[in-house]
From Swiss-Prot:
Native organism taxonomy: Bacteria, Bacillati, Bacillota, Clostridia, Eubacteriales
Classification via Pfam families: Asp_decarbox
Binding site for substrate: 57, 73-75
Annotated catalysed reactions: L-aspartate + H(+) = beta-alanine + CO2
Cofactor annotation: pyruvate
Organism: Ruminiclostridium cellulolyticum (strain ATCC 35319 / DSM 5812 / JCM 6584 / H10)
Superkingdom, taxonomy of origin: Bacteria
Keywords per UniProt: Autocatalytic cleavage, Cytoplasm, Decarboxylase, Lyase, Pantothenate biosynthesis, Pyruvate, Schiff base, Zymogen
Compartments it resides in: Cytoplasm
Family: Belongs to the PanD family.
Listed name of the protein: Aspartate 1-decarboxylase
Length: 128
């Protein structure tokens, strides 16, 4: 039996754009995708810290170093520029694989530049 675990997370990214008339997805700076181990076109969950909305979409790689976080299509209705979001990808694995698994957690500043990366997260404690 497989279970689903967090595989990659970009924590408290700042929305830089919202493009309602685009076909869909979230555009994310490729540097952030790589750091979090999230692939282009991978399904992600986006949580808007400002309004509590949680949505699913897929990723599109944005220009490296651009800091872009752009909600596209219908998802653009759920965020405004400057909102803070958490972007999470999940992976299915066996229980044996899960016991050894460590997620990639990426923290960013207000300009979506990486400030810290870790592979461990526990309530009240983050270990690098």
């Amino acid at each position: 039996m497989n279970i689903t675990l967090l595989s990659g997370k970009i924590h408290r990214a700042t929305v830089t754009q919202a493009e309602l008339n685009y076909v869909g997805s979230i555009t994310i700076d490729q540097d952030l995708l790589e750091a979090a181990g999230i692939m282009e076109y991978e399904k992600v969950c986006v949580v808007n810290i400002n309004n509590g909305i949680r949505l699913e979409t897929y990723t599109i790689a944005g220009e490296k170093g651009s800091g872009i976080i752009c909600l596209n299509g219908a998802a653009a209705r759920y965020a405004q520029v400057s909102d803070k979001v958490i972007i999470m990808a999940y992976a299915q694995m066996t229980k044996e694989e899960a016991q050894k698994h460590k997620p990639n957690v990426v923290f960013v500043d207000d300009n979506n530049r990486i400030t810290r990366k870790t592979n461990y997260e526990k309530h009240g404690q983050i270990v690098e």
